[in-house]
């Protein structure tokens, strides 16, 4: 509850997209946050005419973020990532969300990430090993056992950096 209060900078009891974007370490991308507000239960503020999230919707978001390995969380995220509601994440969706991660990395670090969009898209498809090569279904995402990693790569610049630096971090002395 304290995190919710800290995020609620205008202290109106609701969170707007800009406030929610500061969740965690501030690595969430705006296209992902926009999808949260498009797909989850939100309210239109009469004063600002923008969508805002109440505490109940925030709790659903937090539970999904904290327990990304759970199938229920993957259902939550899949709904957000599936832009057209087709039940498939194709190259377009992967590129759309990862492009935003690359942009967020520039905002945070001031320099581009040392990777190519196509390489990461191919790596995600290799990780998931979808039953059909044209796209990733919810079942593929759950069954692959790395769905949480894929969600992080597509939604959060900090999660992508952690994934990208995983081998380096494994060899760091403590």
Regions found by a protein language model. Give the residues of each.
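Alpha-helix boundary/capping detector
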Residues: 46, 84, 104, 167-168
């Amino acid at each position: 509850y304290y995190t919710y209060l800290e995020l609620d900078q205008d202290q109106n009891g609701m969170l707007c997209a800009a406030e929610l974007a500061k969740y965690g370490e501030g690595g969430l991308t705006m296209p992902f946050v926009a999808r949260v507000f498009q797909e989850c239960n939100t309210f239109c503020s009469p004063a600002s005419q923008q969508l805002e999230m109440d505490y109940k919707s925030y709790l659903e978001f937090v539970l999904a973020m904290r327990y990304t390995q759970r199938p229920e969380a993957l259902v939550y995220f899949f709904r957000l990532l599936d832009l057209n509601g087709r039940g498939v994440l194709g190259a377009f969706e992967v590129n759309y969300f990862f492009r935003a991660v690359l942009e967020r990395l520039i905002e945070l670090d001031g320099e581009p990430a040392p990777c190519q969009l196509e390489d990461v898209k191919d790596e995600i498809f290799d990780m998931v090993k979808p039953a059909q090569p044209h796209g990733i279904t919810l079942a593929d995402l759950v069954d692959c056992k790395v769905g949480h990693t894929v969600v992080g790569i597509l939604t959060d610049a900090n999660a992508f950096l952690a994934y990208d630096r995983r081998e380096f971090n494994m060899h760091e002395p403590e």
